[in-house]
Amino acid sequence: MEEVIQAGLAQWSRQKGLALPWDRTRGHPDVPWRNLTSSPTRPLAQPAGSCMPAEPSPAAHYHQLHVHLQLLPSDLSERPGLRLAPLALVEVGMTLPVPQTPLPHVTQQQKLAPGRQLCPW
């Protein structure tokens, strides 16, 4: 009965926009619908009083997400079920940070034909 109450309370608070302390973690032991698999945007749940910060730094978010998405294309041919994985990594309302330095593949212009400008998009 307690699990049902906890699940109902959690769903109600999500609809009302209230933030629960464990809402952005892998889940809560009393809430079966929030038991999620591990992903870069959801670190493992930390016990109360731990020294782990509540939110990782934006750079860590970007690095982990970027590395994870780089691994997906090779997996798609073998396991088509992973096609929705990039969407599942992004929290609703989460904004991805923009890196301050350009990515390496954007700055390498020596592979282009002479006289052609690199399209920024």
UniProtKB/Swiss-Prot annotation:
Superkingdom, natural source: Eukaryota
Cellular component annotations (GO), alphabetically ordered: protein-containing complex
Segments of this protein annotated with the region Disordered: 21-57
Assembly with partners or alone: Interacts with core protein of hepatitis B virus.
Protein name listed in UniProt: Putative viral protein-binding protein C1
